[in-house]
Amino acid sequence: MSLLTGYLLGSIPSAYLVTRRLIGRDIRQMGGGNVGGLNTFREVGTGAGISVAFIDLVKGTLAVSVSYYLLTQNAQWVILTGFMAVIGHNWSVWLDFKGGKGLGPAFGAMLFLLPVYGLPQQLGILALLVFIPLALTRNIALATGIALFSLPFLVWYGSHSEFATLISVLLFLMIGGKFVLDNRKSLRDPANRRNLIVDHWKRPDKG
């Protein structure tokens, strides 16, 4: 029940719903086709992108908090529920199993899990690993990539939990793999590869 709850909450297609509501278009047919906050930010607007990012964050936090407070006290099941929320976001049952990259629900789940299981310092370090590179490069892909790569080391150092560390590794591989798969055509072109890696945060000039 806990895992199904995580998946269904994660699968709520916020980027699709917000874009449909605001401009009547399908976000899957816009920009890179990613059903997430960054593509919404770039293709629909700043307010829409921020709204989607916030909703996606809440999906992850809500999934693990519902699991923890209402469904189970078993830490492994709660952590897996957060992981399932990311899977639901990336492969939504409502969008023919298409979706985003999972950053929003992943970080939303961590906002709850790390403090609850005694790792508030790791949450602070993780936040710095996002915001410092983001401030220096304005590159959300690079900043979140650094944070996700560091997550297994932070979790292991703070908890020595093999299970939690394994889930952290799988989370990094899943989100990183989704990024590569979603952008595989663009990554073949050196110019596009540079834009995706260096300028991924910037909104294009709509003219």
Swiss-Prot record:
This is Glycerol-3-phosphate acyltransferase 1. It holds the Pfam family G3P_acyltransf. It catalyses: an acyl phosphate + sn-glycerol 3-phosphate = a 1-acyl-sn-glycero-3-phosphate + phosphate. Keywords: Cell membrane, Lipid biosynthesis, Lipid metabolism, Membrane, Phospholipid biosynthesis, Phospholipid metabolism, Transferase, Transmembrane, Transmembrane helix. GO terms for molecular function: acyl-phosphate glycerol-3-phosphate acyltransferase activity. It is a multi-pass membrane protein. Probably interacts with PlsX. It is found in: Cell membrane. Its main location: membrane. InterPro entries: G3P_acylTferase_PlsY. One of its GO terms (cellular component) is plasma membrane. Pathway: Lipid metabolism; phospholipid metabolism. Its EC number is 2.3.1.275. PANTHER family: GLYCEROL-3-PHOSPHATE ACYLTRANSFERASE-RELATED, INNER MEMBRANE PROTEIN YGIH. It comes from the Bacteria. GO terms for biological process: phospholipid biosynthetic process. Belongs to the PlsY family.
